[in-house]
C-alpha cells in the first residue's frame, strides 16, 4: 500500500458506505433504504424454486 492519497473533507463526504444488506436486495444506511432490483429478483426466484422443490420432495 505505497500509493495512498489522503482524502479531503469534501471527498470524504461523497463516499457512501456503511450500508446494511438484508440479503434480499434491500440495503439501508442511516439516511435511506434502497433496493438492488437485480439482487431482489434473484432472491425472489430462488425462493420460489426452493419452495417448489421442497413441495415436490414432500410428495
Swiss-Prot record:
State the compartments where it is located. Answer: Secreted
Where is it mostly found?
A: secreted
Record's keyword annotation contains Amino-acid biosynthesis: no
Q: Which GO cellular component terms, listed alphabetically, does the Swiss-Prot or TrEMBL entry include? A: extracellular region
Which residues does the propeptide include? Answer: 1-18
InterPro entries for the chain: Bacteriocin_IIa, Bacteriocin_IIa_CS, Bacteriocin_IIa_dom_sf, Bacteriocin_signal_seq
Please give one Pfam family short name. Bacteriocin_II
Q: Which domain of life is it from?
A: Bacteria
GO biological process assignments: defense response to bacterium; killing of cells of another organism
- Sorted alphabetically, which keywords does the UniProt record give? Antibiotic, Antimicrobial, Bacteriocin, Disulfide bond, Secreted
Q: Which cysteines are joined by disulfide bonds?
A: 28-33
Role this protein plays: Bactericidal activity; inhibits closely related Lactobacilli, Listeria monocytogenes and ivanovvi, Enterococcus faecalis, Carnobacterium sp and Brocothrix thermosphacta.
The similarity annotation says: Belongs to the bacteriocin class IIA/YGNGV family.
**Official protein name in the record:** Bacteriocin sakacin-A
What is the scientific name of the source organism? Latilactobacillus sakei
